[in-house]
Swiss-Prot record:
One of its GO terms (cellular component) is host cell plasmodesma. The keyword Transport applies. It comes from Cucumber mosaic virus (strain NT9). Transports viral genome to neighboring plant cells directly through plasmosdesmata, without any budding. The movement protein allows efficient cell to cell propagation, by bypassing the host cell wall barrier. Acts by forming a tubular structure at the host plasmodesmata, enlarging it enough to allow free passage of virion capsids. It holds the Pfam family 3A. Its main location: host cell. The keyword Transport applies. It is found in: Host cell junction, Host plasmodesma. Belongs to the cucumovirus movement protein family. This is Movement protein.
Length: 283
């Protein structure tokens, strides 16, 4: 999920007469690539022991600088009413575990403002997820628009902060977090109704029950079992039949078909071998 919009909506959002430059900044292949590589937009971020705290700004530094310069130049020229604001209606995070449910650990995920040195959760937009609760969906909704300014050496914007706690003995990846959002930029700003951070626990996917038809593995196993049963049945049955046959059945060998009414046919009907009291006789 990348930035979306048209030149018309960008013009309305920025109150600018021309938006070609802003559109290029936001939607160029380079800008979209930076959103993915620097901000993990729509990508899976692995939480490891050597990366126990992750801070992901929602706008890359280079893109932030170019957008801020665009609004500042318009503001200085008297064409725009401000130096620009960043608006994010919602941030959605999909969280899944990559270890057993027995692992003792948790994740603390929250929305922060890089203008705050302490990186405290803004508006209580913070959620704690225990390992055994996963998978889950988390949503954040900030109540204000963030000014596109530089504070000290930090480019001010919203950021997703993820903290890993516990997981003693697990040095590798214990959880995967995939975040999506859509940032908007305008020369106007507003305040919004406070909505608590959302946490929705999701039932794990039952991949066996969801199959409408037998899976390839199930079909293979069934076919293999059928083959084994069939071969065992044929061999066993043949052996049992051979042992169970009477002496008369063993001697009753089929002869080629003979025309009805012929002398051979009459002889065939007359002389039939039988066993009577252990003695072979012809009748």
């Amino acid at each position: 999920m990348a930035f979306q919009g048209t030149s018309r909506t960008l013009t309305q959002q920025s109150s600018a007469a021309t938006s070609d430059e802003l559109q290029k900044i936001l939607f160029s292949p380079e800008a979209i690539k930076k959103m993915a590589t620097e901000c993990d937009l729509g990508r899976h971020h692995w939480m490891r022991a050597d990366n126990a705290i992750s801070v992901r700004p929602l706008v890359p530094e280079v893109t932030h600088g170019r957008i801020a310069s665009f609004f500042k130049s318009g503001y200085d020229a008297g064409e725009l009413s401000s130096k620009g604001y960043m608006s994010v209606p919602q941030v959605l995070c999909a969280v899944t575990r990559t270890v057993s449910t027995d692992a003792e650990g948790s994740l603390r995920i929250y929305l922060a403002d890089l203008g705050d040195k302490e990186l405290s959760p803004i508006d209580g937009q913070c959620v704690t997820l225990h390992n055994h609760d996963l998978p889950a969906l988390v949503s954040f909704q900030p109540t204000y628009d963030c000014p596109m300014e530089t504070v000290g050496n930090r480019k001010r914007c919203f950021a997703v902060v993820i903290e890993r706690h516990g997981y003693i003995g697990y040095t590798g990846t214990t959880a995967s977090v995939c975040s999506n959002w859509q940032a908007r930029f305008s020369s106007k700003n507003n305040n919004y109704t406070h909505i608590a951070a959302g946490k929705t626990l999701v039932l794990p996917f039952n991949r066996l029950a969801e199959q409408t038809k037998p899976s390839a593995v199930a079909r293979l196993l069934k076919s293999q079992l059928n083959n084994i049963e069939s071969s065992q049945y044929v061999l066993t049955n043949a052996k049992i039949n051979q042992n169970a046959r009477s002496e008369s059945e063993e001697l009753n060998v089929e002869s080629p078909p003979i025309a009805i009414g012929s002398s051979s046919a009459s002889r065939s009907e007359t002389f039939r071998p039988q066993v009577v009291n252990g003695t072979l006789v012809f009748s």
